[in-house]
Amino acid sequence: MDWILPIAGIIAAIAFLVLCIGIVVVLISVKKNLDHVAKTLDGVEGQVQGITRETTDLLHKANRLTEDIQGKVERLNSVVDGVKGIGDSVQNLNGSVDRVTNSITHNISQNEDKISQVVQWSNVAMEIADKWQNRHYRRGSANYRNTSVGNDANHSNENYTTNVEKNF
């Protein structure tokens, strides 16, 4: 039985050696995987740095573009304000024209009879003026001695009447 102990020690040593070899194999495999992961991370780090540079450049461009757009919007606001002012002025002008038109229409409708009388009296005045001119012209001509007031009446056959329609 004395021999069992050394054999058990040898078996334990062999088992320990196999265990160590297994651990070494596993550690070598883990080292290869870690080396591969390290290389992948180095590649990812380079890509992240490139993406970071591109992102920074894009942010700078976006900031410049935003500033440019803000400047243009501010200038455009003054144009829009000017157009709004013109629109307000045109609207005020339209309101004034409407008020004046309504006032004129109202005054015409109130003074319709007076306007009709003025037109009739102006027609009478024009007839009298024409007769006066005809008489004055005849007096100045050589045939004045042959004409009489009766002839003046014969020459007044011209009709100077004017009809005024009341469409107000």
Swiss-Prot record:
Pfam family membership, one: DUF948
CC per GO annotation: plasma membrane
Region feature (Disordered): 144-168
InterPro entries from the UniProt entry: UPF0478
Membrane topology reported for the UniProt record: Single-pass membrane protein
Subcellular location: Cell membrane
Presence of the UniProt keyword Transmembrane in the record: yes
Organism domain of life: Bacteria
Membrane-spanning parts: 7-27
Keyword tags: Cell membrane, Membrane, Transmembrane, Transmembrane helix
Principal location: membrane
Family (UniProt): Belongs to the UPF0478 family.
Protein name: UPF0478 protein SH1183
Species of provenance: Staphylococcus haemolyticus (strain JCSC1435)
